[in-house]
């Protein structure tokens, strides 16, 4: 059922995977990603924990209406959040690739 090495080998692999996941989560938390809107007129930088680190607004937008600026900031934040999610998925995809898991076994992520 568990292939060569039995349950002990599976437990060892699970521990190794847990260690890799811990390191990967620390790496992801330190990442910074910038989202943009309005063709780069508004930029929002967030970290892997989705905390906003920086907001950059092109000076030309200060003359426009408040609602448009608010929409651009929200769109830039959403773009940054989408980018960090994609980066997290890419980094986590390789964690379980070396494990010999039973057929049909699904990881919790």
Curated annotation (Swiss-Prot):
SUPFAM superfamilies: YbaB-like
Biological role stated in the UniProt entry: Binds to DNA and alters its conformation. May be involved in regulation of gene expression, nucleoid organization and DNA protection.
Source species of the chain: Photorhabdus laumondii subsp. laumondii (strain DSM 15139 / CIP 105565 / TT01)
Residue runs in coiled coils: none
Protein name: Nucleoid-associated protein plu3840
PANTHER family in alphabetical order: NUCLEOID-ASSOCIATED PROTEIN YBAB (PTHR33449:SF1)
Quaternary data: Homodimer.
InterPro entries: YbaB-like_sf, YbaB/EbfC
GO cellular component: bacterial nucleoid; cytosol
Matches recorded under Pfam families: YbaB_DNA_bd (PF02575)
Family (UniProt): Belongs to the YbaB/EbfC family.
GO MF assignments: DNA binding
Keyword DNA-binding annotated: yes
Lineage summary: Bacteria, Pseudomonadati, Pseudomonadota, Gammaproteobacteria, Enterobacterales
Domain of life (superkingdom): Bacteria
Keywords tagged on the record: Cytoplasm, DNA-binding
Compartment annotation: Cytoplasm, Nucleoid
Region entry Disordered, spans: 1-23, 89-109
